[in-house]
Amino acid sequence: MLIEEDFPMIRKTLVIFTLALAALVLGCDDDGDAVTTSRDPVPPGNPVAGRQIFRFDTFGNERFWTDTLRMHEVIQSAVDPLTALAVGLKVDADALPPGILGQVDLTDPATTVALLELDAVVGLKAEVENGTIRRVGVTCALCHSDVDDSVQEGIGRRLDGYPNRDLDPGRILSLSPALQDPAVQAVLTSWGPGRYDAYWNHDGVNDPSMIPPAYGLDGVAVETFTGEGPVSYWNAYVAVTQMHSQGSFFDPELGIDIRATPDLVTPKLPDLQAYQLTLPAPAPPGGSFDAEAAARGQVVFGGQGTCAGCHTPPTFTDAGERVHSPSETGMDPVLAGRGTTGGYRTTPLRGAWQHPPYFHDGSAATLGDVVEHYDAFLGLGLSVQQKADLVEFLKSL
């Protein structure tokens, strides 16, 4: 694990991010009125409007991704479609004119610009004029949408809510001319695909987590890894402090108080959350598990495996808002210590087959590794057959 003090020049980079946030505050009201904490629930929203926000709304973050990071220059000059796919960006096939892929040069950055003009690059939103990118920003879908690969790998129909475990956010950020210090490069290129550190620019600790699913959250009491607040809280935190959007975020426990006028984030949180809560966990593909073994595994799950004590049906997570200390589950404690709860939620198991690796840090490559971890840590004494059956049950959820 890399610590800020190990890399003095990282402080300079953190200043870049901090100044970007400070710029948001310049337009804020100065009347001293209290601001509602970002942990508070939001009112019901419109999921149809929320889908548009999830897919296409940058909340005004173009000034960071364009003016500060200069990513428009990088894309324009060096990111052809094959490079974009290699760093995990996805292409929405429904946005493409018929037959276009057979007519364009996938090694030419100009093709990427054309795809951006079509709104076909999932999670990127660009203003293109006469073949030149003028502004570029990012949306929620960058990390929390995948595609079904129905055209080819990385190109297909959108799968909103799926974690993009191919996306390499650190590698993408490392392309910015503003982030070329060797110490910063060492941090960003250490993350790897499917991992992002949402606290690094706040505390300087390098300890990335897996990009989580944004599906299957309806009825789940604790919606984030460390349970700081509802999904609207995390949406606001990420939008303002990570995407560097023009919005307000207030959490005194984290010591963050950012006010923006106009606030382009907070009014959209109800609709965004409403859409996310409509996204179901994906059912397992037909033939992907042994039904008889899964039935036996269900018995283990509720019996000797003791899994059901925390993973309570039908969502297969804690029924209440409980979080567990790392010592209860044998988890790495670093992320828990960086948040405000000091613990981790019980991860919902619906759709678990879809998003390996497992645990917040990706330390379990397979569901079998998950079972082995808890069998050893809790001293369950499961037989080889019981563990295999339990894996089949988990694959069936």
Write out the residue ranges for each language-model feature.
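Periplasmic c-type cytochrome electron-transfer domains
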Residues: P8, T13-L14, V25-L397
